Regions:
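N-terminal targeting sequences that direct proteins away from the cytosol to non-cytosolic compartments
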Residues: 1-128, 178-181, 201, 217-218, ...
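Second-shell loop/turn segments in exported
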Residues: 90-91, 142-151, 175, 196-198, ...
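Ordered hydrophobic segments in well-structured contexts
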Residues: 98-100, 134-139, 186-192, 208-210, ...
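Extracytoplasmic/secreted proteins, especially bacterial periplasmic and envelope-associated proteins
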Residues: 100, 151, 155, 159, ...
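Beta-strand elements of well-folded, non-transmembrane domains
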Residues: 105, 143, 193-197, 230
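A short acidic-to-branched-hydrophobic micro-motif
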Residues: 120-155, 222-227
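Low-complexity, flexible helical/coil segments
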Residues: 140-147, 159, 170-176, 225-231, ...
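Signature of long, low-cysteine stretches enriched in small and polar/charged residues
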Residues: 153-216
Length: 259
């Protein structure tokens, strides 16, 4: 049975905002937008976070060390963010960054274009259209550093977790903590859920959402949303997301550009 789950999240107002668009497609016809109704598409409402001046301590930003050059394997494709085709919030909150992904992954043509909600989205699939692993890059409005954002990360994570809970059957937030992506300090939460009634049965869903503050005192941070399903044979739990399978390439190669 065909199934589609769409999550559209936008956080704005006050100090912080974020936008992501993720499509988990257990199976979706490529030439039509019509899908069978079970499970029906789910779109979240738009939450808003209002941060008071006391929520964010204006601390001096500590600039992380310059990351070493990434040695890309022969089958890797580089994505370099560009402002050329962006409009709206993505143009307003543009960030220079790059990463590599395997050439067998599919680049989503709906990201990084006018009207898009993500700078980039790439996906590993089983034919014809079953998600195994997914990597999407969005943005959030930052106070300028990990130190300055630290006090509001738990609030932002709680708001996003509440939205995921409404959208994913069997949703559970598993953990929440500070993290690192290479030399960059960040904050993340991990979660589990299900994608039900697909033609391959009920699929386990595991996810990580990482906030990466800007490195040079800018106001635009990056969000990395990673999702995986039990169709990825190397993954057995949420702890494997970004550690096993093919997502590690994206985390290891992610680099901020000039801010």
């Amino acid at each position: 049975m065909l199934g589609i789950l769409v999550v559209l999240l936008v956080l704005g107002g006050g100090v912080l905002g974020a936008a992501y668009f993720f499509v988990l497609r257990p199976m979706l016809a490529r030439r039509t937008m019509i899908v069978e109704p079970s499970p029906s598409p789910v779109q979240t409402s738009t939450p808003t976070i209002e941060a008071t001046p006391n929520d964010v301590a204006q601390k001096e930003a500590s600039v992380p060390a310059e990351p070493p050059a990434y040695s890309a394997p022969a089958d890797a494709v580089e994505f370099v963010n560009s402002k050329q085709k962006l409009d709206g919030k993505l143009a307003e909150h543009y960030v220079d960054f790059s990463f590599y992904y395997p050439n067998r992954w599919l680049k989503d043509s709906s990201a990084g274009v006018p009207g898009a909600a993500n700078f980039a989205k790439v996906e590993r699939r089983l034919p014809p259209d079953f998600t195994q692993e997914n990597f999407a890059v969005g943005w959030y409005s930052s106070a300028g550093s990990a130190e300055a954002d630290r006090s509001v990360f738990p609030t932002l994570a709680a708001k996003l977790s509440a939205q995921f809970e409404k959208s994913f059957p069997g949703y559970t937030k598993v953990s929440e903590s500070e993290t690192k992506v290479g030399v960059y300090d960040g904050y993340e939460f991990r979660f589990e859920g299900m994608s039900r009634n697909t033609s391959k049965g009920d699929l386990k869903l595991w996810g990580r959402l990482i906030f990466l503050p800007p490195v040079n005192g800018g106001k635009n941070g990056i969000t990395l949303l990673m999702l995986a399903t039990s169709l990825a044979p190397e993954l057995k739990s949420v702890d494997d997301v970004g550690a096993r399978g093919e997502l590690p390439m994206m985390l290891q190669s992610f680099r901020f550009g000039k801010q």
